[in-house]
Amino acid sequence: MAKILCVLYPDPVNGYPKTYARDEIPNITVYDNGQTAPTPKAIDFKPGELLGSVSGELGLRKYLEGLGHEFIVTSDKEGPDSEFEKHLPDAEIIISQPFWPAYLGPERLAKAKKLKLALTAGIGSDHVDLESAIKHGVTVAEVTGSNSISVSEHAVMMILSLVRNYIPAHEWAEKGGWNIADCVERSYDVEGMHVGTVAAGRIGLAILKRMKPFDVHLHYYARHRLSKEEEEELGLTFHENVEDMVKVCDVVTINAPLHPETHHMFDEAMIKKMKRGAYIVNTARAEICDRDAIVRAVESGHLAGYAGDVWNPQPAPADHPWRTMPWNGMTPHMSGTSLSGQARYTAGTREILECWFEGRPIREDYVIVDGGKLAGTGALSYTVLEHHHHHH
Ligand code: NDP
């Protein structure tokens, strides 16, 4: 019998929903790159339900208790007196979502003596110190592909809303005004603009595909070039380095994982190389940008706007400057946890747990760290400081 510790975000302020806005969600079985959506043997929830908050329990309680395991679910994750720290020393499996990350730094990993599996219900395992996980022989897995489209749709929405000045215009409507000039003094068309992505993995490529019909010029920077066919189909301009790309872009969207190579990639110096009036949309990870350099750039007008849904730390404190800086289109970290995305990543979490308990290998695509090294998707997309992995 194992103790499974699961950290989830709190229920809605008005309580766990009794009804939903829609009765069903489309059933997506295969992703764009041919990867199949999760295939657990069974699920104990109805797709479209709220599963990512504490009462939703990722739909796992019946399954895990049925196997005789102890299943602890909490949102109390910070500080030495938290529920999370209390259960940490004897948890064998920790499940957490990037939206409400149970940070597993070196100290916590040293304390988690029984930990064997750190499972990210979602995508992005940077809240786990991968070097320490490697050192302690902890397996790290995430549900690769499960919410890539959820995030790319959010990024496209943010690009359009920044460029067209949607949020301030909506505020005028709500306030009872009819201030057309106020709404449009910062409103442009995206058509004809240069839009570039940092990284063209699942999310980056999906954003490029979704922006293509807007008749923009598409650019990308990546460590590995896409195929000639993909470049031609989308009319992509490839850049060997980020600097060259940002110089020519009106909109830059960031879609790389957070690891030593991408940490503070967008600092003062990089932002200076961007065109005056450019926009940044970052739904990847906050620490890829230097927080205060972003604030200064929107305040000075060098950047015309910044939007995203990722913050450091999470939850962001009430006085985080990105909440109130000018021309921001921030949301809490929500893009990857739409009800549609949840249905897939909870099914993927179930699939990984079934594999784990039945002694079957976890899909390569889902593995980040295994056997004391970066493996699977982890070996492709991440680096740790000691050793640089660059195979593809
Ligand atoms: P993928 O693994 O499909 O793609 C990541 C890509 O990043 C890979 O193609 C990799 O390319 C590239 N990459 C890694 N390092 C660099 C670098 N230094 N420079 C340029 N490219 C780099 O992941 P996804 O697209 O699904 O997700 C990307 C990230 O988005 C996640 O790691 C996560 O942090 C974030 N995310 C955010 C969510 C949200 O709710 N806001 C939800 C889901 C994900 P290569 O190895 O070929 O260089």
Please place each PLM-identified region on the residue numbering:
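Phosphate-binding beta-alpha-beta segment of Rossmann-like dinucleotide-binding domains, i.e.
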Residues: 136-138, 143-194, 206-209, 213, ...
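An N-terminal-biased, well-structured beta-alpha scaffold segment characteristic
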Residues: 2-139, 267, 388-392
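Rossmann-like dinucleotide-binding domain for NAD(H)/NADP(H)
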Residues: 140, 277-392
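Rossmann-like dinucleotide/phosphate-binding beta-alpha-beta segment
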Residues: 26, 166, 181-276, 296, ...
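Conserved beta-strand positions in the Rossmann-like core of class I SAM-dependent methyltransferases
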Residues: 72, 219, 287
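Residue-level detector of alpha-helix initiation sites
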Residues: 124-127, 142, 146, 202
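Alpha-helix C-terminal capping/helix-to-coil transition sites in glycosyltransferase folds
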Residues: 89-90, 114, 247-248, 273-276, ...
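Short glycine-/small-residue-rich Rossmann-like dinucleotide-binding loops
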Residues: 98-99, 123, 250, 256-258, ...
